[in-house]
């Protein structure tokens, strides 16, 4: 995915998104024994490139990029290294300088998924091919004098062998059991090996790639949703919010009519939020238990209701996009729309206006937003506001 991993800042780019659950989760994550094993392995550059070409090493990507030949089930991350940085990396190998390890995850089909080291590996593959991903010739320029102007094809035999025979250390991780992917998620939340920050959703999209992730990507293009959220978010915050809405809609369905039942509440939602979202993706990865057509229609209808009721600022709370408010409002609306109980525009407008002035609700969407009581507090408040006579 990239050459670095760190926790997401609570305020994202573009329209600001307040997501207090990120900080809140830090005190809630189970730090017990992880469900994974790992070992070190050394791969020569030639072998890495061969495995990449044969797709035995998978570089996850978010949007199809057939020209680059690196698309795997819909995931693509923007190429974040400049041409100059790619050239410097190749130069480092040719000069025999040490480079950081890469991190690989063993997939069920025995392929390797790259979770740290994407840019290094794509650079090696590009240099071997002779072309940058944009189609321009990969020729070394701002490098040591004796390497200037060189391509892989024009390297002398000694330099070519030095490059291809260079060993790159890999940490190979094997998930163990049902908790394996969640352990990997937590592990990469602690990595910080380069200069590109990975967000939680970028990790999820790689670890849980498949029909549900691809379907959420399609929902992210809904016209009303785009009007409410704004420009497509380069770090997938819009994608993550849709996931949260879908997961919370399942919670609403489980507790409707039993809001005060502690057993129902414990069964429907357990913090931290990050693990709750991971579990939802794991459970519904293949979408077999979800009615995609009905959910898509309800999602679009819900976004359109908010847009008609309050315009493009309909999802904003106290002047900002607020993740906790969005997951509560849209999840309840989707649940009601699915059951043919959609409120009219005026009701939606009045409900949101009421919620924006409710001191308890403001607290539930602003503090400790991953905690169970606050999750159910905001969900029930929205449900009551939208269904009361």
Predicted region positions:
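C-terminal subdomains that position terminal phosphate/3'-OH groups for nucleotidyl transfer/ligation
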Residues: 242-389
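Intrinsically disordered, low-structural-confidence terminal and linker regions
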Residues: 1-26
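Sequence-level preference for short, compositionally simple segments enriched
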Residues: 56-59
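Short amphipathic alpha-helical segments and their helix-coil junctions
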Residues: 70, 74, 217-232, 298-316
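Basic- and aromatic-enriched surface patches that contact anionic nucleotides/nucleic acids
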Residues: 13, 26-54, 75-271, 345, ...
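A C-terminal-region feature
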Residues: 2-4, 35, 39, 385-388
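C-terminal active-site subregion of NodB/CE4 polysaccharide deacetylases
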Residues: 66
